[in-house]
Each structure stands twice: as structure tokens, then as C-alpha cells.
């Protein structure tokens, strides 16, 4: 075995590509490394097409092995299970830029498998996997119009940083991944701390320029190690069949695409499609239904795109920059902590915000380390939202991806834990869908959070944009419909506040989209976002001053860290009894910060008072009320503040001589005692004699407790 190796510098890192030694039965296999983070990527492509195949069956699997980080998986079976949310998102990140680079009409099955086999905690495996997939596809000989490069762009101290480390990323105001060929950007996925449109576009251009190093390196690698390119020729169009479909359907489809209501339009289009299939198959029984449908779909695209380029009204009658009618309701669910319904045309999201305590945080165990997530965002897309029946179950890749995009849009305005000590979960239920449900989720989430009283820094809105380009002419569409989404050449989603962008996702299907075109599109998206924010601000101008009556209120207090063990008690007995008896939950940080969550404020104040008693210092000369806990021949033990026990010697029980302790005291009896002495070992000596005017200490919980709501 003589492996072929290509090594090159990429920014501050060294990238190594190796092939020829492992997985030689795969169509292509590449071991891609970047500073000890290594991803093994294989490509298997079938030479034959399944009979009746009418779509491109590309599958991308991304899997992380725990041995890559020197760990053994948890759980009973001690092996990796189903893909995590993070793995699913990275699989989508690999898929999106490579899919448009396969030629139209190529229907051979291809599977890309990326396996993380070694990980440097400072280098995220996602970029390495994208570079490895690009290299493997380029070597494989399949008709892939790559290679692509991939870059991560950070923004630190007002400077763009190429492929920042995990430590650097914590200081960055931007996390942007861009992928593309030597000529064009194909995919952008980003999260930003409210940057301007100009800064976002500059980051995209910067990343695309820098990744040319990768594109050139893979081309050189392929010259040395690549397999012969497949002798694949695109199938010739069946002009006779195309003309037949046009003759039957063109005029009728033109009329159907003037119906503004989605369901009525779809019914009409389905009827036309069924009629076309019936007429053509009646004339020619051997005519393929799949090919007829493909031609019919292409005709739909041609009609809609032609009208847009010609400047005619869109499918629903709007101009290119008009946003659909908006309708907003907040506080729609009486017992939830915050809720809103956001409707834009025929797209509708029911967003619900729930407040929880720190123990509700999600613990995420990644290869690069364990972390806690205090802001959860879940997106559900049930089949009824598009008038269909279907399976209801665990979230699919699309739902996970849309939920993450919506979360990115809102994350920048969320308060820190110090400002608002709650774990927050937002769920977006898509109840209607006709384009851009993920951006409706951003708007709905912003409204629900404000309804819940979460002090977000600003309202956030999202908008989905499209672009249609024919030669030198192009048209940017604001607030695209579902039909416009898949017929366009670029679709991108922008979320942000009035001040700037918080998330940008872009998928480009053709070459020739220049930075100038992107700038025009981003500016048009900004105008649409401002319009939506204006309507949202009318519905709820600021976060509610108070949280819901049904949400837990979190009260904080400070204790001496040395006293934490006293509050917890032996085996957790003290803290357990406090929570069980009062119905509260208590979290204690190492610095002595105590957080008490309770729906009932009286219960919280009760707990705080009891904690103050537990941690209170016993002072010599002060009289306390205590309870007799046990009797001995030589005296009685009495528990005073914080269940601290002291001894009342038999000689200190009464003024007269005491023969038998039980003649004077019983277990459980409440008595007043004075602290005589606390010795070096912390033992407390008490007396019941000479109790001058009572000086019982009173602990004022109100003075030392700060309520945070």
C-alpha cells in the first residue's frame, strides 16, 4: 500500500489529505486532518441507475466516534447510538453545498460517510468533514462539478479571523461557515451578534477568497490520486414529449398560477397534471409517468420564472418586495409562561416560551467537551400544516435544521444567566406553511419571549428571500412562497433586529451570483425586516414587566461558602427536607449563591428564613429559643439556630440543685437558653440560669434577599 498524501497550510492550521491505504473497496476514501482533528470520508457511487428512478438519491452521513476524544460511550450498551442533533446539523452542512454540483438528470445513488476518528478540542470537525467530502467526491470520478472549499469566519476586535479555534470563537461576534467552488459561493450558515449587512457580506467574501487554497489543493490532489471521470452523458430531452405536455398544459397552468390561494391552486394544478398523464399515456402506453411529471414540473418553473423576470405580479399577486399580510396575537395560551401566534400570509407559527431553573439546562456531551445549554429551541412541522396526513414522531433532519436556524436568530438578544437566572425553552409549532416557516418561528419566538417577560435586548424578525436570474436579468423576491422557494436560483433567510443581523442562511444553486447581487438582496431583506418589526412592536412594544403567575420565581441569596455543607446536610438530608416541605427547588453555586425557585412567594420566603437560621453564627452572651433534643445524666442537649446543638450542664438548668434532669426537661420541649461559651472545637456551652431581658436574635430575611423576576 502506497498512500498518496497532500499537505498544505490553511490559515493558521495544517491540512493533510491522504488516500490509497484505507477502505480501498469504496469508490473513493480520504483521511482528512487539520491539526489532529481527523475525519475519514468515503464515497460509494452505484454505476447503475435503479429502474424508474426520477430523483438524485444522495445520502450524507456524519458520525462521531467517542474514541476520537479518548472516551467510552455512556449508557447501558456502551456504544454510539442514533445521530445526535449536532451530527445531523453537520450532515446537512456537508450536503447543502455539494448537492447542486451534480448535473441535472444524474440519478445514480451516492452515499457519503464522514466518520470523526480523532479530535483536537480546539478544532471543530465540521470543516474537516466538508473538506474531506469535497476531496473524496473529486477523486471518485463521478460527475461532480467541484471541488468545493469551506471556511469558518470569526469577527474578533473588528477583524475577520479565518478558521478560529474553539477558544478564539468564544471571543468572536460571528460564527459563519461559507462553502463554494473557485467561481461561486454555494452555501452560508451563520450566527452573529447583531452585525450590519455590509459586515456579513464582507465576511462571506472574505471566507470565499480564503478557501481558494483548499480548492486548488484538492485539484492538485486529484491530478495525482483521482480516478478516471465517469463517461456519463446527460439524457437527451424528449422534445416530442415536451411539446405534447406543453400543448395540453401550458395555457391551463398559466391560469392556475394566477390563483392566489394555495390549496385551490394546488387542486387545479393536480387536476391538470392528472389530465396530462391520462391523455399522453392513453396515446402511448409506454410513456413514462415519471418523465411526464418531470417535464410538467419544468414547465411550471418556466411559467413562474418567466413572469417574475418579465416584471409581472407574483403567484399571489404581490410585487417583488411586498411582504404578505401579517397578523399577531400574544398571550393566547392561558397557563403557559408566554405564547404568541404569528401569521404571515398562509404561514403560521404558534410559539410558546417556558421558564425553568438551572437544573432544566440541557447537558450536551460533545467530542470537544461537555457543556450546558440554557436556551432551548424546538421546531415542529406536523403534516397538517400543509394539509396532508403523515407520520408523527421524532424530529426529522429538516425540523432539526430549521429549529437551529431559528435559535441562531434569537440567541444574540437573550439575556445572560446573571441578568435572568432562568433556563428558557421555546417551542415553535408550525400550524400552517407556505414558505419560510423557520423565519415565522423567529418572529413567533421573539413575541413569546416578550410575552413571558424575558428581558430580551431587542425584538427579532426573520424574512426569507429568493432570487431568479436569467442571463443578465435578475429579480430579488421578498417573503417567498413555498412554490417560489424551489423554483428560484438562490434562497436565503435573514434574521435580525433594527440594529443588525443575528443569523444568515444562504443556499445558491447557480454560478454568477456576484457580491453586488447579494448586497442588493440583503438590503431588500433589511427593508422587509423593518416592516415586520414595525408590526411586531405594535403588538408588544417591550417585554412584559413581570413574568407569568404560573412561572417559577427565582429568589437569590448569598451565604458563606463554608456553610454550604450545613445547608445541604448529611447525605443531602437538610436540603431535601427543605424542598419537600416547601415545594420549592434549591440550587447552590460554589460561591455561596443560593437560588430558590417557587411559584408561591411565601414558600420561598419560608425557605430563605430557614436557610438564614441554618447559616447563622452563634454568639456568646445571646439568648436563643431552642428545643431539647436528648437527655443525659449530666445535662441536656438543646438545638438552637441552624440545628446547632449545645449542652446545658445539669448545674445550669435551674437556680436550685437538680437531682434528675428529666424532672425539669423533656425531649422536644422548647426552652430559652443563653450561650455561655463556644470553645476552640466549636462546642457550645449553654445555661438556663440568669436569663436577663430577652435578647433573642431576629434574622430579617428581607434585608439579605434579592428577588429576581
Swiss-Prot record:
Pfam family, one: RNase_PH
UniProt EC number: 2.7.7.8
Residue stretches making up the KH domain: 552-622
Source superkingdom: Bacteria
Domain S1 motif: 621-689
Compartments (UniProt record): Cytoplasm
Entry cofactors: Mg(2+)
Record Gene3D superfamilies: GHMP Kinase, N-terminal domain (3.30.230.70), K Homology domain, type 1 (3.30.1370.10), Nucleic acid-binding proteins (2.40.50.140)
Keywords: Cytoplasm, Magnesium, Metal-binding, Nucleotidyltransferase, RNA-binding, Transferase
One GO CC annotation: cytosol
Catalytic activity: RNA(n+1) + phosphate = RNA(n) + a ribonucleoside 5'-diphosphate
Enzyme class of the recorded protein, top EC level: transferase
CDD domains: KH-I_PNPase (cd02393), RNase_PH_PNPase_1 (cd11363), RNase_PH_PNPase_2 (cd11364), S1_PNPase (cd04472)
Main location, first listed in the record: cytoplasm
Residues annotated for Mg(2+) binding in this entry: 485, 491
Molecular function terms from GO: 3'-5'-RNA exonuclease activity; magnesium ion binding; polyribonucleotide nucleotidyltransferase activity; RNA binding
GO biological process: mRNA catabolic process; RNA catabolic process; RNA processing
Family: Belongs to the polyribonucleotide nucleotidyltransferase family.
Stated role: Involved in mRNA degradation. Catalyzes the phosphorolysis of single-stranded polyribonucleotides processively in the 3'- to 5'-direction.
Summary of subunit composition and partner proteins: Component of the RNA degradosome, which is a multiprotein complex involved in RNA processing and mRNA degradation.
Name assigned to this protein: Polyribonucleotide nucleotidyltransferase
Annotated source species: Haemophilus influenzae (strain ATCC 51907 / DSM 11121 / KW20 / Rd)
Amino acid at each position: 500500500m502506497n498512500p498518496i498524501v497532500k499537505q498544505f497550510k490553511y490559515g493558521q492550521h495544517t491540512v493533510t489529505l491522504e488516500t490509497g491505504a484505507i477502505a480501498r473497496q469504496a469508490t473513493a476514501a480520504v483521511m482528512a486532518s487539520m491539526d489532529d482533528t481527523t475525519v475519514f470520508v468515503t464515497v460509494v457511487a452505484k454505476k447503475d441507475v435503479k429502474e424508474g428512478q426520477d430523483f438524485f438519491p444522495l445520502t450524507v452521513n456524519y458520525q462521531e466516534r467517542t474514541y476520537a476524544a479518548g472516551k467510552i460511550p455512556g449508557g447501558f450498551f456502551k456504544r454510539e447510538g442514533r445521530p445526535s442533533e449536532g451530527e445531523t446539523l453537520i450532515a446537512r452542512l456537508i450536503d447543502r453545498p455539494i448537492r447542486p454540483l451534480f448535473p441535472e438528470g444524474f440519478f445514480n445513488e451516492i452515499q457519503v460517510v464522514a466518520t470523526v476518528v480523532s479530535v483536537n478540542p480546539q478544532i471543530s470537525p465540521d470543516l474537516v468533514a466538508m473538506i474531506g467530502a469535497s476531496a473524496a467526491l473529486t477523486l471518485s470520478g463521478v460527475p461532480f462539478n467541484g471541488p468545493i472549499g469551506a471556511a469558518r469566519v470569526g469577527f474578533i476586535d473588528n477583524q475577520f479571523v479565518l478558521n478560529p479555534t474553539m477558544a478564539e470563537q468564544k471571543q468572536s461576534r460571528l460564527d459563519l461557515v461559507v462553502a463554494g467552488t473557485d467561481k461561486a459561493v454555494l452555501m452560508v450558515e451563520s450566527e452573529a451578534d447583531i452585525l450590519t449587512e455590509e459586515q456579513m457580506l464582507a465576511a462571506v467574501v472574505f471566507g470565499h477568497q480564503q478557501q481558494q487554497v483548499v480548492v486548488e489543493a484538492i485539484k492538485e490532489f486529484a491530478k495525482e490520486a483521482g480516478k478516471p471521470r465517469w463517461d456519463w452523458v446527460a439524457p437527451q430531452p424528449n422534445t416530442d414529449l415536451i411539446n405534447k405536455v406543453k400543448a395540453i398544459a401550458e395555457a391551463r397552468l398559466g391560469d392556475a398560477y394566477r390563483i392566489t390561494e394555495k390549496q385551490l391552486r394546488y387542486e387545479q394544478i393536480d387536476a391538470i397534471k392528472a389530465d396530462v398523464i391520462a391523455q399522453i399515456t392513453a396515446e402511448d402506453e409506454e410513456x413514462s409517468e415519471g418523465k411526464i411529471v418531470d417535464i410538467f414540473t419544468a414547465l411550471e418553473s418556466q411559467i413562474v420564472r418567466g413572469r417574475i423576470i418579465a416584471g409581472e405580479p407574483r403567484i399571489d399577486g404581490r410585487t417583488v418586495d411586498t411582504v404578505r399580510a401579517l397578523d399577531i396575537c400574544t398571550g393566547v395560551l392561558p397557563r403557559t409562561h408566554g405564547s404568541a401566534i404569528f401569521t404571515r400570509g398562509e404561514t403560521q407559527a404558534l410559539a410558546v416560551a417556558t421558564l425553568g431553573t438551572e437544573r432544566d439546562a440541557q447537558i450536551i456531551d460533545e467530542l470537544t467537551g461537555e457543556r450546558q445549554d440554557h436556551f432551548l429551541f424546538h421546531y415542529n412541522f406536523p403534516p397538517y400544516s400543509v394539509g396532508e396526513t403523515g407520520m408523527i414522531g421524532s424530529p426529522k433532519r429538516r425540523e432539526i435544521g430549521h429549529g437551529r436556524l431559528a435559535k441562531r436568530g434569537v440567541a444574540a438578544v437573550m439575556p445572560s444567566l446573571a441578568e435572568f437566572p432562568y433556563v428558557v425553552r421555546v417551542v415553535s409549532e408550525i400550524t400552517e406553511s407556505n414558505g419560510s416557516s423557520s423565519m415565522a418561528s423567529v418572529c413567533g419566538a421573539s413575541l413569546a419571549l416578550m410575552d413571558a417577560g424575558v428581558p430580551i435586548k431587542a425584538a427579532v424578525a426573520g424574512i426569507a428571500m429568493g432570487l431568479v436570474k436569467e442571463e443578465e436579468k435578475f429579480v430579488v423576491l421578498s417573503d417567498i412562497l413555498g412554490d417560489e422557494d424551489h423554483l428560484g436560483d438562490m434562497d436565503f433567510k435573514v434574521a435580525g433586529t433594527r440594529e443588525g443581523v443575528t443569523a444568515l442562511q444562504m443556499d445558491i444553486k447557480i454560478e454568477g451570483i456576484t457580491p453586488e447581487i447579494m448586497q442588493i438582496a440583503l438590503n431588500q431583506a433589511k427593508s422587509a425586516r423593518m416592516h415586520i418589526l414595525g408590526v411586531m412592536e405594535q403588538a408588544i412594544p417591550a417585554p412584559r414587566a413581570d413574568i407569568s403567575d404560573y412561572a417559577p420565581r427565582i429568589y437569590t441569596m448569598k451565604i458563606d461558602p463554608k456553610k454550604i455543607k450545613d445547608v445541604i446536610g448529611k447525605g443531602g438530608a437538610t436540603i431535601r427536607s427543605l424542598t419537600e416541605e416547601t415545594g420549592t427547588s434549591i440550587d447552590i453555586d460554589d460561591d455561596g449563591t443560593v437560588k430558590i425557585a417557587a411559584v408561591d412567594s411565601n414558600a420561598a420566603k419560608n425557605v430563605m428564613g430557614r436557610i438564614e437560621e441554618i447559616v447563622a453564627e452563634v454568639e456568646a452572651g445571646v439568648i436563643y429559643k431552642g428545643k431539647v433534643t436528648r437527655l443525659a445524666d449530666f445535662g441536656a442537649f438543646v438545638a438552637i439556630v441552624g440545628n446547632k446543638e449545645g449542652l446545658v450542664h445539669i448545674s445550669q438548668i435551674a437556680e436550685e440543685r437538680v437531682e434528675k434532669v428529666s424532672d425539669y426537661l423533656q425531649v422536644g420541649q422548647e426552652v430559652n437558653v443563653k450561650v455561655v461559651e463556644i470553645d476552640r472545637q466549636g462546642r457550645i456551652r449553654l445555661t438556663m440560669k440568669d436569663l436577663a431581658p430577652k435578647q433573642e436574635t431576629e434574622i430579617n430575611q428581607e434585608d439579605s434577599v434579592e428577588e429576581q423576576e
